[in-house]
Amino acid sequence: MALTYILFQVAVALLAILTYYIHRKLTYFKRRGIPFVAPHLIRGNMEELQKTKNIHEIFQDHYNKFRESKAPFVGFFFFQSPAAFVIDLELAKQILIKDFSNFSNKGIFYNEKDDPISAHLFNLDGAQWRLLRNKLSSTFTSGKMKLMYPTVVSVANEFMTVMHEKVPKNSVLEIRDLVARFTVDVIGTCAFGIQCNSLRDEKAEFLYFGKRSLVDKRHGTLLNGFMRSYPKLARKLGMVRTAPHIQEFYSRIVTETVAVREKEHIKRNDFMDMLIELKNQKEMTLENGDVVRGLTMEEVLAQAFVFFIAGFETSSSTMGFALYELAKNPDIQDKVRAEVEEVIEQHDQNFTYECTKDLKYLNQVLDETLRLYTIVPNLDRMAAKRYVVPGHPNFVIEAGQSVIIPSSAIHHDPSIYPEPFEFRPERFSPEESAGRPSVAWLPFGDGPRNCIGLRFGQMQARIGLALLIRNFKFSTCSKTPNPLVYDPKSFVLGVKDGIYLKVETV
């Protein structure tokens, strides 16, 4: 009886401690006088996530609620994690660029011991991130992009051949799937040196696992929220985010690719070559003069994985959304086609690396697509030390606090981009761009932790779109969704039921 009473008292005490702890968490901003929206006990301000709204819409609603306030940031509960939700562009610039040294970390969950594929450049923090970023920076120079360019064009030419075969048989095509197959074949070739053949093989393995990697999770929304809110505890508990079949597939592919290349002394001037070269360097000298070891096999695996996933989803989605807008705006499409023809003619009918730089209007189309359809909705940062917002002494970001910069919401702010839901490439003319802060456009982030692969992603999308528009005319049809319906279960900007367009040869 006494033991039961003691256990009951212990349980009551633990419950009281837990209740107090959660109460302190959920009143975090109230106690500091920071504007916020009352959170759900468990889901915080993410209550509608995967029910009726995707994360883009949740962030957009929160941003719109406080957009005209004078607050540089407001409170947002990412599940139970209180985050500083940035409203002011000047604060965004301070965090991303001027005071980057205090905000270089992201605070995202990863577990290099139990889930090595998760310890990639996108997730890592501190000295690990800095070291890896320095090691990999040389792999994405313009010179390296020029070496990969012929490979991308070769895949793009095969894409055109497949399209010419498909169009006479069926003029209405689901365009998102087609551009996804193109990007999978490009990245499979450039990252792994493997002919994926997804353009012709309906059941291509790389395409299947590329899509599943973005959908299949080991845990549901609540456990993923727990890992996000308590990353250190989740790591100590040995929690893993990557689904086992995804882990097994990429581990096998990377291990086999490295083994074959090293045994046969194969050189392809691609991303995998660069990773193997870094792996085999016992010592390497960084730009700052530090001498460090090369990459481990686990680091090679993680970087190859994130290169594939990031390049596949962002490039294919951007191309799909661009074609959708060009189909709805035939005058813009005609202008792009005329520019492509003119530029190729200037280069003696050769689609050279220099051509992509001369396609000024096409680049504006891509920039506007990335604004209107921002694939990843936000940038994550975490404060290393207590930070008083310049000019706002009552707004303090505490050490260890998460920061959310809602890039997609910023891209749809009418005070920055008038009529933000209209597709207007002229916004990115040199004249209009000069009138906006650089941090008003953040599809690749900004500052020292911007997207390391942005050059490759842009090159791939430019080549694919230029050749598609040169060879085909895209228009809307009865199956074209208007407006687009987004998938609430997708973290990246995903469309339900695809994008159907009418396609004709030019």
UniProtKB/Swiss-Prot annotation:
Per the record, its GO cellular-component terms are: endomembrane system; endoplasmic reticulum membrane
User: Which co-factors does it depend on?
Assistant: heme
The UniProt family comment states:
Belongs to the cytochrome P450 family.
InterPro entries attached to this UniProt entry: Cyt_P450, Cyt_P450_CS, Cyt_P450_E_grp-I, Cyt_P450_sf, Insect_CytP450_Detox
Q: Does the keyword Metal-binding feature in the UniProt annotation?
A: yes
- Keywords, comma-separated and alphabetical: Endoplasmic reticulum, Heme, Iron, Membrane, Metal-binding, Microsome, Monooxygenase, Oxidoreductase
Q: Where is the signal peptide?
A: none
**Pfam families referenced in this protein's UniProt entry, alphabetically:** p450
Instruction: Look up and give the organism this protein is from.
Output: Drosophila melanogaster
What EC identifiers does the entry list? 1.14.-.-
**What is this protein identified as?**
Cytochrome P450 6a8
Recorded GO terms, molecular function?
A: alkane 1-monooxygenase activity; fatty acid binding; heme binding; iron ion binding; medium-chain fatty acid omega-1 hydroxylase activity
Entry-linked Gene3D superfamilies: Cytochrome P450
